[in-house]
């Protein structure tokens, strides 16, 4: 049995078998009401910045006791409110991404406004005039789709291409929020913890080598 730390804004706890699949862990959290029933299609587990396969197990990825595993929504998922289950043993912190509503509004406006003129027998016998052709082209012209906006909840600025993509939470951010500290990335806590652990091991090793050399 292993105890995993899943990083976001709230915490839960659950003991899982290291040979159980990650998909079964999703089902277990769904049964407790922490995640929705369709959580597998909306969220994914991440370990060291790599998205985990739902059919693999913790042992396959080398996830040991007290490892830091992240849960983050997929780019197409919506905001989800988690309930509080203090009896479980699985630390879960969740910071949902803000969905982009601009593109959906543009598509709905296009469906309501754009119409295709019908073809009658008179149109087949009498070719349309130049003025009619230009008006038909105007009706068939689709409105320009809006560019993607920053995933930060309080920002509506345009995202940076490539440089604004976060590899840890799959978010797309503007110049002001592209750094992990600026958009409160879900992986920031675990990365700092791993760096602290590496520094601790390095200092302990250097201290031990110093004592051996003095002896």
UniProtKB/Swiss-Prot annotation:
This is AN1-type zinc finger protein C1271.05c. A zinc finger (AN1-type) spans 144-193. GO terms for molecular function: zinc ion binding. Disulfide bonds: none annotated. One of its GO terms (biological process) is SRP-dependent cotranslational protein targeting to membrane, translocation. Zn(2+) 1 binds at residues 150, 155, 174, 177. It comes from the Eukaryota. Zn(2+) 2 binds at residues 166, 169, 183, 185. Keywords: Cytoplasm, Metal-binding, Nucleus, Zinc, Zinc-finger. Residues 116-138 are annotated as: Disordered. InterPro entries: AN1-like_Znf, Ubiquitin-like_domsf, Znf_AN1. Residues 116-128 have a biased composition (Polar residues). SMART domains: ZnF_AN1 (SM00154). One of its GO terms (cellular component) is nucleus. It is found in: Cytoplasm; Nucleus. PANTHER family: ARSENITE INDUCUBLE RNA ASSOCIATED PROTEIN AIP-1-RELATED (PTHR14677), ZINC FINGER AN1-TYPE CONTAINING 2A-RELATED (PTHR14677:SF20). Its main location: cytoplasm. PROSITE patterns: ZF_AN1.
